[in-house]
A protein has these predicted regions:
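Aromatic-anchored segments of alpha-helical transmembrane domains
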Residues: 22-26, 95-103, 173-183, 227-236
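Cysteine-based protein phosphatase catalytic domain of the PTP/DSP
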Residues: 120-129, 142, 310-447, 467-475, ...
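Membrane-interface loops
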Residues: 33-49, 77-172, 178, 204, ...
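PTP/DSP superfamily signal
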Residues: 211-308, 317, 430-451, 467-474, ...
């Protein structure tokens, strides 16, 4: 069943599309005006002999003004959430690609246009005030007209065929008049119009292949960052008395690096089932991002490290009010699990002490003072954060500072906000089976060591040895709000500890801060994992 978007969702999509347009369009306009003032020879002239044959028709200011009206109205005319998302994708892609071209190929309308002395003069006066004669190729009016026409083509259906035909003829006429008005009002040249058509066709092809909003999000961030850095470098260079070319070139290099990194990340999100291919975010055996990964994604890694610091602050604030407690959950008397953000070195020791021994060290002291074997611990760190290094290395140091504890490291590179059903089920099963193998392995090793100790007269029952072994499984991501909790829930479903009937109430009880929407942790994945019970506790 097709889902009808809410008015709030329509306004959100409209606000995003308009915000990106006004930010980037005005940014490139200001840049072009400054460039024309300082270096007029760098502004291109796109006049052709055919442009002089085109008449100026003042009344065409009316259909020219329809562009914004149709732009806004289209978000309330589409009928389904899919149509709404596709509409927003198309308009945003056209905007960011056009503004990149405006930066790399700045052009200016070359004809002089006098303001008519009739009823249209107010429209042209307003146009002259808000729209400078730059940002020419491609014409966004033309691109938007084509994209809006295609996006609205199927939104109106009637049992009477002539009504549907009339609607489409009206839509075609409006979009055609908008496109023609760009040259008949002397706002654009013919090449600009042609460029707008080409851009619209490319966007239509690309938008139908984009998997989700995360791809668009990172393309937007890449283009916005590029333009802000490059244009800021241009102004700093022209304010600098020395080495102005060096400053501008350096800014362009940094901006290009930013754009390439975010474009590559968008490409990773575009991949279907990308987890098996971990070459994008490689890590060492101790969970540290490799140099190769840093070279590719340094801007993203720096941003996520900042988010990690924010996550630490978030945790401390809510832990004071006891709303956010990193308390391990006991699957049974041998295995505990806990989901967390990536923890800082300064916080690891206190967290680890609490995870292993609770609020005091009485258990540890009593085991050391008695003749019974001390409780032995092993820690399995499951790293789910592709964008930052794990805390495994520092946790191992902290664990050895408290007592001799074995730390194992497992890595499943999930991308931020990537729906958990994007991962192959077998990847989850492989991870969970590795966890089970480590749990079984440490028990076997402990029993073997106990059997070898008989010569010293210290042998104890195997049941006592098993009872003295505790495994702590730490699922961690960047901020501890989605990935770590979501995969922990899947593991508990896999173990049979949770069911499809109680997992949501369990999340609300243990992680009320969690950000797990149905689109992120879909019911279908929960049901599949709950039915895949290979271990009985």
């Amino acid at each position: 069943m097709l889902q009808t978007p809410s008015n709030l969702n329509r306004f959100k999509h409209l606000g995003l599309a308009l915000s990106i347009f006004y930010l980037l369009y005005n940014l490139t306009t200001v840049y072009s005006v400054s460039l024309h003032t300082l270096y007029p020879s760098q502004i291109h002239n796109l006049t052709t002999p055919f442009d002089s044959m085109i008449p100026f028709i003042p009344a065409m200011i009316v259909p020219y003004s329809w562009s914004l009206i149709l732009f806004v109205a289209s978000f309330f005319l589409v009928r389904t959430s899919t149509q709404l998302s596709l509409l927003a994708y198309r308009l945003i892609l056209a905007t960011i690609f056009a503004c990149l071209i405006f930066y790399f190929y700045p052009a200016r309308f070359s004809f002089s246009r006098s303001i008519p002395d009739d009823w249209t003069q107010f429209g042209y006066q307003f146009l002259q005030l808000v729209d400078k004669p730059f940002n020419q190729l491609p014409s966004l009016h033309v691109s938007y007209a084509m994209l809006l026409g295609v996006s609205l083509w199927n939104v109106f259906e009637s049992k009477k065929r002539w009504i549907s035909v009339a609607y489409r003829l009206l839509l075609t006429s409006i979009c055609t008049l908008i496109a023609l008005s760009t040259v008949l009002t002397y706002q654009h040249h013919l090449l600009d119009m042609f460029g707008g058509v080409v851009l619209a066709v490319l966007v239509l092809i690309l938008s139908n292949r984009i998997r989700n909003a995360l791809v668009i999000k990172h393309l937007i961030l890449g283009v916005i960052g590029f333009l802000l850095i490059a244009i800021a470098g241009f102004y700093f260079a022209n304010m600098s008395m020395i080495a102005s070319e060096v400053v501008e070139d350096l800014a362009i290099m940094i901006a290009s690096y930013w754009l390439i990194s975010f474009t590559m990340l968008a490409g990773v999100y575009q991949q279907v089932k990308p987890i098996r291919d971990i070459r994008w975010f490689q890590k060492s055996s101790s969970g540290r991002l490799t140099l190769h990964t840093w070279i590719k994604f340094a801007p993203i890694i720096i941003i996520y490290n900042g988010m990690s610091l924010f996550g630490q602050w978030y945790f401390k604030i809510f832990s004071k009010s006891q709303k956010y407690s990193l308390t391990p959950y006991a699957i049974n008397d041998k295995v505990n699990v806990v989901a967390s953000p990536r923890l800082m070195q300064t916080d690891l020791s206190s967290h680890l002490t609490y995870w292993l021994f609770g609020s005091s060290l009485l258990e540890l002291r009593s085991s050391l003072e008695s003749n019974r074997p001390a409780v032995c611990h092993q820690i399995i760190v499951v790293d789910l954060a592709a964008e930052i290094s794990s805390h495994t290395h520092n946790l191992e140091i902290a664990a050895n500072g408290i007592m001799n504890t074995t730390v194992h490291y497992l890595y499943l590179p999930l991308l931020d906000l990537q729906p958990l059903n994007d991962v192959l089920l077998q990847d989850y099963i492989d991870l969970f089976q590795k966890i089970e193998a480590l749990i079984q392995s440490v028990e076997t090793q402990a029993i073997t060591a106990n059997n070898e100790s008989w010569v010293e007269g210290n042998q104890v029952e195997d049941s006592q040895v098993k009872g003295g072994l505790i495994t702590l499984i730490n699922f961690h991501c960047v901020m501890g709000l989605s990935r770590s909790i979501g995969v922990q829930v899947l593991y508990l479903l896999y173990c049979g500890t949770l069911t499809v009937y109680n997992y949501q109430s369990w999340i609300e009880q243990h992680y009320p801060h969690a950000h797990l929407k149905d689109t992120y942790l879909p019911q279908s994945l929960v049901e599949t994992m709950a039915n895949y019970k290979s271990v009985t506790y």
